[in-house]
Amino acid sequence: MKLDKSAILIKKACLEFEKIANAVLEEYDLTVSQYKVMKYLYEESENGVRIVDLEKYYSMSHPTAIGIVQNLEKKGLVEYRDNPNHARSRYIAPTAKAVQKRPELESLGDDLEAEMTHNLSEREREQLVDLLRKMMGLEGE
């Protein structure tokens, strides 16, 4: 059967990435979902990250986001902090332990990206990213 439908190919690529990434991340006691949350926290923690921010960014349900954060908290990688601007709101932030691991985890992300796109030239990789962003309506971001 010829695979010529973009939705099927994108899903297969996602599953292949998760298979490769989970094998690599096992050494760090992280799942792909936990890694993605850590990556987001590294990038956005200065702006204050709430559970709802994770839900929106990754299109995940509230229970899923809560579960991932709770597991990261048990591993000592994230903590909740009070929001000084809103008494009923809390932020999620990387712990000192997580900040120490940041360079290694970010490098790991680059390695995973390279592994997934190793059959593409640099120009093809850029085109792929551009097309995926366009498909998702993220061209200007």
Predicted regions and their residues:
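C-terminal regulatory/oligomerization modules of transcriptional regulators
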Residues: M1, E122-E141
